[in-house]
């Protein structure tokens, strides 16, 4: 496995999870969460796609910067529908709203600490927001087991935002 190779050669394994996936529990303990550092831990999925497009459009020239001279993220990876790839033809939007809808809801719940009612007042569907809020609370146990990572936003998971994992906690 990658972790075994990491240990054998003394390298740190990086994880690929982002804030959107970690928020709603779309991460596998001892799977894509296994590693020593999470570069994308505090970046929402739409931000990750934006960063990929930006990097592909801003290619360093020889002697100007680090990295290969040319696009580094294939367009097919950016445009492919997101999936945990745990079963054939699975797509994240089979069970979640599109990330263009999910990420603003998560931003409101996590960064701004808004209630379901406040997000509904902003025009989001009540059932969708309530379901996302529930997923956010239920996935707390997974986030506690994730590797450390970069902090980009005002409220990252860990020190900035922790909720109980054992007592069926829900906000009132």
Question: Could you describe each region identified by the protein language model?
Answer:
Residues 1-172:
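ATP/NTP-dependent adenylation/nucleotidyl-transfer catalytic domains that generate, transfer
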């Amino acid at each position: 496995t990658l972790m075994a190779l990491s240990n054998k050669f003394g390298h740190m394994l990086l994880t690929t999870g982002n804030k959107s996936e970690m928020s709603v529990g779309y991460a596998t303990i001892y799977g894509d969460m296994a590693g020593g550092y999470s570069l994308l831990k505090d970046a929402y999925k739409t931000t990750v796609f934006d960063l990929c497009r930006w990097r592909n459009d801003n290619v360093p020239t020889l002697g100007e910067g680090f990295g290969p001279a040319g696009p580094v993220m294939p367009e097919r990876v950016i445009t492919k529908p997101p999936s945990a790839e745990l079963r054939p033809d699975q797509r994240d939007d089979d069970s979640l709203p599109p990330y263009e809808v999910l990420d603003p809801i998560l931003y409101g719940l996590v960064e701004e600490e808004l209630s379901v009612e406040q997000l509904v007042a902003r025009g989001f569907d009540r059932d969708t927001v309530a379901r996302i809020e529930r997923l956010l609370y239920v996935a707390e146990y997974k986030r506690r087991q994730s590797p450390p990572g970069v902090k980009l936003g005002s409220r990252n998971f860990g020190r900035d935002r922790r909720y109980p994992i054992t007592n069926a906690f829900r906000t009132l």
